[in-house]
Amino acid sequence: MSEPQDTTSPSTAAAPIAASTSHEQPQTQSPPQVSATTTSSVTATAAAATAAVASPPVNGAARPTEELSCLWQGCSEKCPTPESLYEHVCERHVGRKSTNNLNLTCQWGSCRTTTVKRDHITSHIRVHVPLKPHKCDFCGKAFKRPQDLKKHVKTHADDSVLVRSPEPGSRNPDIMFGGNPAKGYATATHYFEPALNPVPSQGYAHGAPQYYQSHHPPQPANPSYGNVYYALNHGHEAGHASYESKKRGYDALNEFFGDLKRRQFDPNSYAAVGQRLLGLQSLSLPILSGGPLPEYQPMPAPVAVGGGGYSPGGHPPAPAYHLPPMSNVRTKNDLINIDQFLQQMQDTIYENDDNVAAAGVAQPGAHYVHGGMSYRTTHSPPSQLPPSHATATTSAGPIMANPATHSPTGTPALTPPSSAQSYTSGRSPISLPSTSRVSPPHHEGGSSMYPRLPSATMSDSMAAGYPTTSSAAPPSTLGGIFDHDDRRRYTGGTLQRARPEERHLPEPMDLSHDNKDDGERTPPAKPRQAPSSPGRISASLIDPALSGSANEAETMRTAQAATEVAERSDVQWVEKVRLIEYLRNYIASRLERGEYDGDSGMTRESRTPEAGPDGHMEGVETEPVSHPAKCESPVKPEAGGDTVMYPTLRGVDEDGDSKMPN
């Protein structure tokens, strides 16, 4: 029976099953179908793997028929299993650098792929060898390399298998061995049985999936599997990572509220507000995860992070995590003060013209609402702009109803403010509450009636009684804003003035130098310099978009670049507005539900008894006050009005006043 095996020629070595057709023809029927693929190395290996699985062994005598031939150039070695074939190619043909026989060029069949490392060539050899240790846990399909499995797992991202949570006693029939032939994944993809696979743990880095039953043996981890994460993995690691990210945002929000209470930054500065909000936008805040209300803040019930899956050993679910209450928003006074600061920040974002200056572009009509018209038609949060403008304008009324003449461009030197554009600005120092000012105390001076330029320095802004917001603004946006139709933006860094002024100025100069008398007395070079000087000035100082000799392509390019910058600034502006709205809704919801400690009331009650002993400690002084009835009657109404403020000083003053006439 061994003669047919000895007479096989090397040309037929590409079909390992064809060598065994002579002594077991009635048992196997698939080799005639595979023998036609001997010309191509890739198809030969694929057919060999298919034939090895399509003909399941009946007894132990049929095992030697599954030999796999090595198609390396000049090699006719045969291996019984794909694992041994892979080890043979890696050790015999690839070699190692330590043994001085390292070969980084693949010579399998007609392949001549060259790599730079041994790990790369060994990973490439998996393409030729029918070794598929990496199996998909969702469909059961096997792959040769871990990167192929990673790409395949991404195809299951939108599959309902990832979203559907399994029942406790259910099994997925498509995942276990045997498969579901109706879906096209036959048992051919699972041909590595435990008896044939001496290294079953090569491709299972995560062990059995958590919804498997516990009768499967545990498998050790292997770093070659890679970092493949599934949506069904609701284990401790995923829950811990989610908890850590939520806690980082939670701590950042608490620190932000603490900075507001301690006035670490100026709420009237658009640059400071934008920089402070930028740190919150990059984190996953618990407020933004579940709508305007926080997910972990009030802690009405324990929140379980992690768990949810059915592990093989029946482990208990992960413990519930609790986030402590915010230390900076415990009392009612804290909530009220923080809400006032947030309102100032909201007014700064909506009505301050520094949002244009800090971005370096002039955004027409973005921060100015005239009557019932609203020019902020894109990238605006729904139903927030008109109420915000209304509240920002009316909130400054009860404090100090002194209208500040405000120029939307912020350039009274070139564009004088008109009465039609003036409105009460929420960011003006005279309209801010006296309890929340950070700027110098001389706000009520006469200079506070005039708005400041965005290009003003810090010393100028402080001397004028305005916040230092303008120090962060570049000296730009010196142009008109009434281009409401085309919404044109101008880039910063160049001076801009109106077009009629630029055209009218050179014309009388040209007419004055074109006289015949001047031409006779003046050399011909001076008339050439007259029209060249305005061009040089316009090229260096004036925006090229306003000069008549500018190239149209450059003008379009400049306008397009400015438009892109303005759109990005619009997106950032909208994100800041939405974040402020979320924070204000969160504070308002806590105030409405009464979710705050009673420390504020306790402190007020505790202060009144302290005031009493202070008064009783001065009891020696109150005895002479009780004797004259004339001094006691005017003291009671004053003490009844402000009993908490100065109880001791009033007693001393009254005692002194009562003794002085005597």
From Swiss-Prot:
Q: Where is this region: Disordered?
A: 1-43, 370-541, 597-662
- Asked if the record carries the keyword Signal, the reply is no
Which residue windows does the record flag with biased composition (Basic and acidic residues)?
498-523, 597-619
- What PROSITE patterns does this protein's entry cite? ZINC_FINGER_C2H2_1, ZINC_FINGER_C2H2_2
Biased composition range(s): Polar residues: 404-438
Q: In its keyword annotation, does this UniProt entry include Methyltransferase?
A: no
Q: Where is this motif: YPX[LI] motif 1?
A: 450-453
Any one GO molecular-function label of the UniProt entry: zinc ion binding
Tell me which GO cellular component terms the UniProt record holds. cytoplasm; nucleus
- Coiled coil location: none
ZnF (C2H2-type) ranges:
68-93, 104-128, 134-156
Low complexity bias located where?
7-43
Q: Where in the cell is it found?
A: Cytoplasm; Nucleus
Q: Motif YPX[LI] motif 2: which ranges? A: 646-649
* GO biological process terms held by the UniProt record: positive regulation of transcription by RNA polymerase II
Mind telling me how this protein is modified after translation? Activated by C-terminal proteolytic cleavage by signaling protease (probably palB/RIM13) at neutral to alkaline ambient pH.
The entry's keywords: Activator, Cytoplasm, DNA-binding, Metal-binding, Nucleus, Repeat, Repressor, Transcription, Transcription regulation, Zinc, Zinc-finger
Q: Which domain of life is it from?
A: Eukaryota
Listed under subunit, the entry gives: Binds to DNA. Interacts with palA, which binds to the two YPX[LI] motifs and is required for proteolytic processing.
Tell me its family: Belongs to the pacC/RIM101 family.
Q: What does this protein do?
A: Transcription factor that mediates regulation of both acid- and alkaline-expressed genes in response to ambient pH. At alkaline ambient pH, activates transcription of alkaline-expressed genes (including pacC itself) and represses transcription of acid-expressed genes.
This chain belongs to the protein called pH-response transcription factor pacC/RIM101
Q: Which organism is it from?
A: Aspergillus oryzae (strain ATCC 42149 / RIB 40)
